[in-house]
Amino acid sequence: MTNGRKMEYKLVDSEKDIERSYEPRRKPKRSRIQLHDWQSMLLEHSFRMNPYPDRIEKYNLFLKTKIPMKNVKIWFQNRRAREKSFYEEAVEVHRDGRRAGHRSLGSRSALFAEEFQYRRY
């Protein structure tokens, strides 16, 4: 006993226990936010109006959707990345006529290519 406290010791029995005691602790798996349909639709509509919202627009989306601002910001980043990959794939399909190993996207790719000619990236 030290300072009125009882000291407890754990005996390590095996080599596995010794190795485990030196392993770094893993972080618990991060939970994901599940968006409702109305939240997704509102974010999509906002994205169509402006893919690069400023802080005030993000704050307004936070107030409307109750999605944390950090998640709104990340949603827009991910959405722009997805849009860019659609565009790049559409340009490739349009240029080559088909994509090796993938089925053609057809008219959808042409629509993306036309739409993105006028967007800034």
Curated annotation (Swiss-Prot):
A GO cellular-component term linked to this record: nucleus
InterPro entries in UniProt: HD, Homeodomain-like_sf
Primary localisation category: nucleus
DNA-binding region, residue intervals: 28-87
Tagged with keyword DNA-binding: yes
Record's keyword terms, sorted: DNA-binding, Homeobox, Nucleus
Keyword Aminoacyl-tRNA synthetase attributed: no
Subcellular location: Nucleus
Any GO MF annotation of the entry: DNA binding
PROSITE patterns: HOMEOBOX_2 (PS50071)
UniProt-recorded name of the protein: Homeobox protein HD-6
